[in-house]
Structure formats: C-alpha cells, structure tokens
Amino acid sequence: MKFLSLFFLALAGVAFAHDGGMGGMDMIKSYSILGAMIGLGIAAFGGAIGMGNAAAATITGTARNPGVGGKLLTTMFVAMAMIEAQVIYTLVFAIIAIYSNPFLS
C-alpha cells in the first residue's frame, strides 16, 4: 500500500511538471485528466472485487446445491451487468469531465 501511494504521488509530480508557463486552463485540464484516471481506476478496482465476490458466491452455491445452478447463473449475470454498468457510468463521467469541462469555457 505504501508503494502504491508513493507511486501515485510520484506520478502526479511527473504529470504536472511544467516550465512555469502553464496557464490556469492547462492546470484545470491536467486536474480533470488526473481526477478522471483516479476515479476510473477506483471504479474498475471496486468492480473487479465485486465481480469476483459474485462469481465466488455463485460457484459456492452451485457446489452446495447443483439443482439451482441455472437460477444462480442467471442471477450472477444480472449482478455482473449491474456492477459493470457502474464502471461504465464512471467511464462516461470521466470522458465528460475531460472533454466538456464547464470550467474551460
């Protein structure tokens, strides 16, 4: 965890390195991109954990009672779609924050 924190802090320094001629609009663009990347990374990480837990629970339920495997599989696919939808919503929000930022106009 300490390595990841140090890595992101070092990455932010490289991302915002400039020669002093950067205006306010460029700084807003940089922060928008950094915020979008961090938000999308957190959403993808949380979605992956949720999908793993859903798959593990479905496999455990099917192993305990093979007769309801079909119903559990259907429920798992619905849960996977809902989890993935949250990640896609975050991606759409990140794209909107980057390309049509209201603070840049």
From Swiss-Prot:
Ranges in coiled-coil conformation: none
GO molecular function, one term: lipid binding
Classification via Gene3D superfamilies: F1F0 ATP synthase subunit C
Superkingdom, natural source: Bacteria
Main location: membrane
InterPro entries: ATP_synth_F0_csu (IPR000454), ATP_synth_F0_csu_DDCD_BS (IPR020537), ATP_synth_F0_csu_sf (IPR038662), ATPase_proteolipid_c-like_dom (IPR002379), F/V-ATP_Csub_sf (IPR035921)
UniProt GO cellular component terms: plasma membrane; proton-transporting ATP synthase complex; proton-transporting two-sector ATPase complex, proton-transporting domain
PROSITE patterns in the record: ATPASE_C
Presence of keyword Ion transport: yes
UniProt KW keywords: ATP synthesis, Cell inner membrane, Cell membrane, CF(0), Hydrogen ion transport, Ion transport, Lipid-binding, Membrane, Transmembrane, Transmembrane helix, Transport
Site entry (Reversibly protonated during proton transport), positions: E84
Pfam families for the chain: ATP-synt_C
Localization terms from the record: Cell inner membrane
Membrane topology, from the record: Multi-pass membrane protein
Quaternary structure annotation from Swiss-Prot or TrEMBL: F-type ATPases have 2 components, F(1) - the catalytic core - and F(0) - the membrane proton channel. F(1) has five subunits: alpha(3), beta(3), gamma(1), delta(1), epsilon(1). F(0) has three main subunits: a(1), b(2) and c(10-14). The alpha and beta chains form an alternating ring which encloses part of the gamma chain. F(1) is attached to F(0) by a central stalk formed by the gamma and epsilon chains, while a peripheral stalk is formed by the delta and b chains.
Function: F(1)F(0) ATP synthase produces ATP from ADP in the presence of a proton or sodium gradient. F-type ATPases consist of two structural domains, F(1) containing the extramembraneous catalytic core and F(0) containing the membrane proton channel, linked together by a central stalk and a peripheral stalk. During catalysis, ATP synthesis in the catalytic domain of F(1) is coupled via a rotary mechanism of the central stalk subunits to proton translocation.
Family, per entry: Belongs to the ATPase C chain family.
Name recorded for this polypeptide: ATP synthase subunit c
Native organism: Helicobacter pylori (strain Shi470)
